[in-house]
Amino acid sequence: GFVKLLEFTQVGASLVFGDLAKSEKLGFIFAFQVLPTIIFFAALMGVLYHAGIMQQIVRGMAWAITKVMRVSGAETTSVCASVFIGQTEAPLTIRPYIAKMTQSEILTIMIGGMAHIAGGVLAAYVGMLGGGDPVQQAFYAKHLLTASIMAAPATLVIAKILAPETGEPLTRGKVRMEVEKTTVNVIDA
């Protein structure tokens, strides 16, 4: 699945950039072989968020972690969103709650952003590490995605060790995700 998406990215980059996108012809050129991957995955995440698919995935992960670890829903939602989207976009999934968060929750959000990499960058790493070999790309994709997902509960543990919860979180035990619809259609996403 993931490797097939990388192949789509390379086919699209070859269509746009021609031989510049093929490392076997002219060697490795970062701008033509890595950046299209990042752009493609950022666009894919935008479309998945527009369709509501990513919200369901993030909400499910956040619900499970909130029940097991007994932390607030807002911080868990942001940390789980960080697995798929970047450090700057993840807190936007809980924007209405940020002003009323405790210091421990805010630190958790910051650590969550730094503990994960955005999906587009993860795809770029898979492409660079795996070279052109689909088997190697699948190997690295599996391990990098697993590490990124495991970092979500680890983020919560480290954050709570550094700054234990002393206040009463507004969303303790509840997972709510209110993402404003900023796109009109899939093209806009």
Describe the function of each predicted region.
Residues 8, 12, 41-45, 50, ...:
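Alpha-helical transmembrane segments of polytopic integral membrane proteins
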Residues 29-51, 67-87:
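Hydrophobic alpha-helical transmembrane segments of multi-pass integral membrane proteins
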Residues 38-42, 140-158:
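Alpha-helical transmembrane segments
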Residues 3-7, 56-70, 82, 96-99, ...:
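Short amphipathic alpha-helical coupling elements at transmembrane boundaries
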Residues 16-26, 65-66, 90-100, 180-188:
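Cytosolic juxtamembrane amphipathic/interface segments immediately preceding
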Residues 1-37:
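Interfacial loop/helix-cap signal at membrane boundaries in integral membrane proteins
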Residues 149-188:
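Long, contiguous bundles of hydrophobic transmembrane helices that form the permeation core
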Residues 68-129:
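Alpha-helical membrane segments and immediately flanking helix-loop junctions
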